[in-house]
Amino acid sequence: MSTLFRVAWYRFRATFSHRWSGYLTIVLLVGLVGGVAMGAIAGARRTQSSFPIYAASTNPSQVDAFIAFVDPAIHDYAGYYPAKARAMAHLPHVKEAETAIGFDANLVLLSHLHTHAEPGQKPPVFEGSTNDDFTKEDRVTLVQGRLANPARRDEVVMNAQAAHQLGLHIGSRVRLGFNSDAQLLSPDCCSAKATPPKVVVDLRLVGIIVVASTVVQDDVDHLGSQVALFTPALTRELAQCCATYSSSALQVDGGAGEIPHVQSEIDAVIGKALATAGNGSGATAGQVQVAVATAERAIRPEAIALAVFGGIAALAAILIAAQVIGRQLRLGADDASVLRALGAGPAVTAADGLLGILGAVVLGSLVAFAVAVALSPLAPIGPVRPVYPYPGVAFDWTVLGFGVLALVAILGALSVGLAYRAAPHREAGRRRGAAARASAVVRAMATAGLPVSAVAGVRLALEPGSGRSAVPVRSAILGAVLALTVVTGTFTFGSSLDTLVSHPSLYGWNWNSMLLSGFSGDEDLPQHEATTLLEHDPYVSGISGIYFGSLKIDGQRVPVLGGSPGAPVQPPLLSGHGFDAANQVVLGATTLADLHAHVGDTVTVSNGATKPTRLTVAGTATMPAIGTQGPHLEMGSGALLDYDLIPATARNLQESTVPGPNAFLIRLRPGANPTSARRSLSRIESRLNASSDGAGGVVGVLRPAEIANYRSIGTLPGLLGGALAVGAVIALGLTLVASVRRRRRDLALLKTLGFTQRQLAATVAWQSTVAVAVGIVVGVPLGIVVGRTLWNLFARDIHAVPLPSVPILSIVLIAVAALVLANVVAAIPGRIAARTPTALILRAE
């Protein structure tokens, strides 16, 4: 073994001067494409974990207790009870407590502002705490300006949504009035006869903040995500006179196992207080805790897409590197034959040049490590990126360590295998058993009378030849196929992703518009009047009235969409059939899995008011993001069933005298002008919601979080795709150059037979073009199949309608660009071959 190494080391030093360029090529290709692969996979992991890491940095609470609300119907006449807040803060296992006090119903906007409310969007929530400025527990994140001074009553911070809705910016001033609780409960409240507000405050917006629970959300939650925070100084002044509601956020000591005990203790405290202090709605999981699960699910598609891209890049790195390594070994075949003639054994001839290649693989893997680290500041992608607490360079040692080891091990093994296969004793055996085979394509072209340069070029591209002049033409063609497969597959997957984002029907919004009642659909639309107006609208082809609610299905609480059996407008199906009868239910795919049920099974639905009902699972559908604030339908979760299963009181929470659906799903006639239709529907909405004080509206689309967040992923996918394309182009170019150089002897013979310089250049161009053409014929369809297959797997994973998109124009441009590249690459070696004296090439023969 020591002798073998000494010989290999000697040969490495002796041949390095004319083999270094090949080694450098291996280093650069492995480093670039392998680094992109590791960077993408590490970025996917960093993206998927980004929100839990951010949430942990805000010091989140685990339990929320909504303890007071001004409402005579529940005998609650004040929005804040300090005694209840103190009692919960001193419960066993509670280590920290923060009480947020809201002033929404008591608040009067006295400034004349240019507001920008979207249809169905709620006004901003105005809250404050008496003992915290939201910098300790459930910390807010400052993104612009500064935090308010806790000791000043005239400063306020808002999130960007609230500032945009109110038309404010840093430095803007707004005047607010606050009615006392007694004024709020007065019959004359908020009318022209009402007394002036008890407290008037001029506030200046000093900062834009982000609240953790609103970082990742769908468009339904976005309708109610506007938040403004008062200082403790102002909150203490308003708490005793003008509070609408209050809730306590609690941190639990002792781990997650103590949370249920604390929740039961909170319910007991609230129950004891009923006789003297009002009513409470119990304890729930903290907002940030709930948001973590939602955010991880919403971010997952971007992380999966990034990981899929990384997997494609990793495969490309291995295959491209294998091609380059094989060519490098073949370049030393003549030297290996000389060594064999001098008495070297199979081990020595196989090891010739292998030491340099293995060194290049190791060095390239280290370069890939550096490239992946250099790409790390581009992650995480998505909505968490602006508030991620630990941006910049990151070392994901799991990906980096395993990635480097995998590259070294896989490429090292391939190098040894290729070196053994290319050893002279094996090569000689193959030559003895191989016979020169003529290509049918070449014969056909010759028979057709095509120019001799064309026939010669096609022969050089397709026929390997025999004996010492044999050339591995399959490697050149395989390199072209590989490059075009990778690029086409990447473009197909990316096009399908763009199609999903731009086609709402693929993510559940299987209609054109929704007529919404109240804020986020929390009121009713008069059934008869709304149906009559919509059915007589010239632009409308179909409508379905729907109700929002939640029911227990097989004991699990599930958000539901109540409709009528056989309604013309329903979410798009994934399996089975639609909701056609009152004894049927259509479920989201995630909900179906959570219930451990299948299409055709029977489930039990209960509402707590009537006898449980057994329903047959008719099918699964891509559920839209739809409903009111809180738990609502999402892409994979929810149920569509008969609206009569939702209790009548739950369908009419505002106790409307003319009850009806919370919303209407509207499908327009084919060819209807969208602008004219929107104006017509807006007139209907104004008539139906005339008394809603601006609430409700016509909504074009509500996107799920998975889709809404896609637009915030930044430039990383484009950069990675560009790097992969560059790697594929470089590999293709090197393949073509090496293929032409291997044919120098054949070109010299053609020149001896009378070929002119122009004919030689044409021959080389034909050789290169044919190799790429075969790559196009095989690689493009294969890339489309790979891209479509990956997309179908991805779409089913996120429960979207699996409809892959093939970018025909882009693929045509890829094919044209590949042909242009083939001729550009062939021009230089073709010109060199034409000008090289024949004697220099044939002298070795």
Annotate each PLM feature.
Residues 1-318, 322, 327-331, 346-347, ...:
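Membrane transport/envelope proteins' first extracytoplasmic loop
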Residues 100, 177, 206, 339, ...:
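Generic beta-strand/beta-sheet core signal
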Residues 1-28, 46-52, 56-60, 330-353, ...:
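Feature of multi-pass inner-membrane transport and sensor proteins
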Residues 59-77, 444-447, 451-581, 586-590, ...:
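Juxtamembrane segments of multi-pass membrane proteins
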